[in-house]
Amino acid sequence: MENFDPLGIHTGESIVVAPTCSLDDQELALLQELSKKVIRHIGIVGECNIQYAFNSETDDYRVIEVNARLSRSSALASKATGYPLAFVAAKLALGYTLDQIGEMGTPNSAYVAPSLDYLICKIPRWDLSKFAGVSRQIGSSMKSVGEIMSIGQSFEEIIQKGLRMIGQGMHGFVGNRDLEFGNLEEELSHPTDLRIFAIAKAFEEGYSIDRIYNLTKIDPWFLGKLKNIHDYSLVLSKYDKIEDVPAAVLQEAKRLGFSDFQIARFVEDPDGNIEKESLRVRAVRKKNNVLPSVKRINTVASENPELTNYLYVTYDGTEHQVPYFKNEKSVVVLGSGAYRIGSSVEFDWCSVNAVQTARKLGYKSIMINYNPETVSTDYDMSDRLYFDELSFERVLDVLDLEMPKGVIVSVGGQIPNNLAIRLHRQDIPVLGTSPLSIDRAENRHKFSSMLDQLGIDQPAWKELSHMDEVYDFVGKVGYPVLVRPSYVLSGAAMNVCYNAEELETFLKLAAKVSKEYPVVVSQFLQNAKEIEFDAVAHNGEVVEYAISEHVEFAGVHSGDATLVFPAQKIYFETARRIKKIGRKIAKELNISGPFNIQFLAKNNDVKVIECNLRASRSFPFVSKVLKRNFIETATRIMLDTSYEKPDNTNFDIDWIGVKASQFSFSRLHNADPVLGVDMSSTGEVGCIGDDFSEALLTSMISVGYSIPKKAVMVSSGDTRSKVDLLDACKMLQDNGYEIYATGGTEKFLAEHGVKAACVSWPDEGKADNVIHMISAHKFDLVINIPKNHSHRELTNGYKIRRGAIDHNIPLITNARLASAFIEAFCEMKEKDIQIKSWQEYKL
């Protein structure tokens, strides 16, 4: 495998291709011989990963590192070749020899090395725009949160496919929205997450391959292929109508990885309905017999490729390598694509369980997904795996060939969910809830009027296109308000504004407000509980459900919040109202399958925030805690087969689950590690305990917190947060902890009988400056609750938060979570946590 980016960029941050493209046979043989020397010298049994730096001008090389284990690139190598490295490594560890290991799905032994008659490309997925102030430069530290793998017959095809797959609104190497680069040479020589698009811009502006090479040090072989794509976009631009484009030109465009969307953009340059024009391109293509072919990936270098079901779609072929016939007993499941902030392994769990249930019921299951990190892209998980795009165009290509009973869009998160109504318009049978109902739930206006019609309360909101309208609306509902711009200039896409100054600053700096780009302003309820309702319904009747609550008050994104199931601290009446509203919505939308509703509750006042007619991030968690597979039930319903109704409720179980979030702020230099309405966590854990303290403590330790040994620093923000933390601070004092606090917090604690040592703010420059003390590791836990959004408060608070992260000191920025954590470790010691397997928790 070869990194597209030069040495200096972490391999996890680099585009990677396989097999190597820019090395000749002699250079490749040299590196292979070196590898054999290394593994024989170390005595490797099993898997090994060696990274080289290689200068092809001088044949000079360096071994960078050797990992005598399965690595991140091992998973990529397995998916790239179809050779199951982990399976073979496990057998070798058990004492088998290579020639004794039969490769899964073929009669061949693992002794045969895989050979590739195709190319693959891995591209990282970054979500840096989620973090205010973060450096976008990429280098030796890994910041990407996911990756994709594309397969094809040419580099041009795989890079264009791959750039569509990363799911950031890009359509390939060319034909994207116009990106602004202040200094293009700077962008090319100091790489950021957008460098590949800076190269596209450079070609547009007439840069030569040599000039780009001198700035980027990316091998000219790759740059030449990218130039081919740019040059062919100019060929397409010469035509005014798609009907005028010769079939040979269309065929070559498709071979170079151009999507129908890109072709429509270059030929027709439509201002209006680009989807309509893309479908026109599709129709003309099909009429001219410019069609894709489906190829197999041979899972070893065997004589029996017909035994494998690992497929990809390409335009560089003349016939399909698999047979096709209409099969009413087949079902297509759309996967979740690249891991990103907001969509991760939870949806892969849902996809895999849907596929397994379909297979159990005798259906031929067909999976479309392109994430090499997932279980759903293991070729033995489904009857057919299309390792390919989840674009509208590609899904239609597969459905045209497979002609299944239908397609499941509700288990892979938002990507497949967004395709539901478009597939419906093409007369594709979508299994489960009707796409028209999905559209009613997804469309803010339709959903809001449905809630009004059903008499269900919701926070007041309005879509506004003038600043005057924004201020009028805020005058009616009062501060704080949640602002969602439709066009974001910089920073987070959503923000809570607590006063007129903040509102004005946010809208001026972060968003455009106009008729074309309206802004949605919602009433924001302070100190309200956020509650999740995960459920499965059949023809509008709720079959099973789970009610879980957030530890944090509303204002922390549900993906970052600490989730407790079953809910421990909500009124019985609140739970009753939530069930009633859930049933009403399920009936009105005639839901058949999974769905999730998010509620706000204050006292017994319950409001609906949103409803998703698909599996949510919390489905695997509640399924595992409750020991009932919600996705299996949902899949059975979608396939019109019998299912088991639960005979117990959420509150019959004698244990508690807590889901805690994992953050990666230490890798994101300069990012402010404070939680808000935009999600920033990159992972999660779920833990079970006999009571809330045990479950919370286990989950917090699992995401990297440690129980403080001696000293805790508290900077508790506004009065409400001070009150929320008071009992917890008393517990710290009673348990012998040293408490340090900033001025206002120290004074408040002293007034209420808690002794704390006062530390000065970062900008005060005194000897007891909190930043000096953080640098000296004087604290075992830092609690910093943002007080308000004034410049001094933000700057001082930011320095404390960032200091804690940079010095690897556990940090909590939410008063309710801090309070719960302190109570948990004061009530229970780490040695008292029981070690129990999941199977030991029994109903």
Locations of the language-model features?
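ATP-dependent carboxylate activation and anion-phosphoryl transfer catalytic cores
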Residues: 1-257, 276, 292-293, 302, ...
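ATP-binding N-terminal substructure of ATP-dependent carboxylate-amine bond-forming enzymes
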Residues: 162, 271-274, 284-289, 295-456, ...
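Residues in the recognition helix of alpha-helical DNA-binding motifs
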Residues: 215, 225-226, 266, 280-284
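Extended, domain-scale alpha-helical bundle/helix-rich regions
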Residues: 253-256, 262-269
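Conserved A3 ("GATE") glycine/threonine-rich loop of ANL adenylate-forming enzymes
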Residues: 442-445, 488-492
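Conserved anion/nucleotide-ligand pocket segment
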Residues: 479-486
